[in-house]
Amino acid sequence: MTAESVMASFAGRARMVDLFAAEWIKFRSLRSTAATLAALVAVYLYLAYRGAQDSYQVWQSMPGRLRPAFDPAHGVFGGPTWMLAMIVAGSVGAMTVTGEHSTGLIRATFTAVPTRRRVAAAKCAVTAAAMTAIGAVIAAGSFAINETVLSGDHVSIPVSSADTIRLLAATSLLLPLCALAGLALGTVIGNTPATVVAVCVLFVFTPFAFKSASTRWTVDAANAMPFSFFSRLTVTGQGHLVGGTESVPAAWTALAAWLAVSAIIVISAMGWRDV
C-alpha cells in the first residue's frame, strides 16, 4: 500500500489515527531515509566507542587533584560531533515535507483531507516519535558503550543517577527537536536544497555567530540554541562548566520552547502556504 492510496481512501474528515497511519507510511517510504538513519546510529555508536577510549586516556593521565571534576560522559556526549546528528535530523525532518512538495503528494493529501492543520499535527507527531526512537537507541547505545569502557577504572556514572537520566533524556530528544525544526523550515521554504542550507546555518553557524559577539544578549541567544543547551544537559561533572553557562532548568525550558515553537510553525504555516 502506497501513501497515495492511503490518502485517496480518506473521505471527509479523517480520524487522527488514520492520519497518523498515513503519515507513518509516507515517512518510512521516503527514499534513503531508513538507510540514512541506520547509518547515523552506526556512526554514533562508533563515535561513542572512540570518545569513551579518549575519556579513559584522559582519566589515566589526569592528576589526582583534578579527578573530582572529571566528566565521564564528556568524551561521548560532549563536543561538536553532535552537530552532524543535528544536521541529519533536521534534513530528514525537512524532507518529510519538501519531498511531498516536489512530487505533488502534498496536494493529493490536502485534496483528500482539507483540514490541513490536522495533517500538519499528524506529521509533527509521527516525525517526532520516529526520531525520538532513533535518538533513544543512540543515547542508550552510546551510554552502554561508555560504561563498558570506563567501568574498569570505576569512573562510570550510575544508570539511576539524576545526571544519567538527564543525559539520556536530552540525547533522546535532540533528534526530534532538530527534525521538527527542519520540518518547520521545510514547510516555510518548500525547497529541499534551500532548506538543508537553512538547517546548517541554524544549527552550526548561528550559535558560533552569537557567541563570537560576546555581549550579554548574544550569549543568552547562544545559550538558547540547541547545541548549547544540549551540551549543558549532558554535563555530568564540573570540569566543563564555564562562565555564562545556562542553568539546567533554563536548558530544559529552551528545549521545550524549541519543540513547541517548531510544531506551531508547522501547523500554522501548512494552513496558509500555497501548495
Predicted regions and their residues:
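Secretory targeting signals
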Residues: 2-13, 33, 37-94, 120-188, ...
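A short amphipathic helical element positioned immediately N-terminal to and/or at the very start
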Residues: 16-28
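Helix-capping/transition residues at the boundaries of transmembrane alpha-helices
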Residues: 26, 98, 109-111, 182, ...
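Helix-loop interface residues and adjacent transmembrane-helix termini in multi-pass membrane transporters
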Residues: 30, 113, 188-189, 272
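Residue-level recognition of membrane-helix boundary sites in multi-pass small-molecule transporters
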Residues: 31-35, 105, 118, 194-195
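Transmembrane helix segments
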Residues: 46-50, 192-228
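Transmembrane helix boundary and interhelical loop/hinge segments in multi-pass membrane proteins
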Residues: 90-112, 116-117, 124
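Membrane-interface capping segments at transmembrane-helix boundaries
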Residues: 267-275
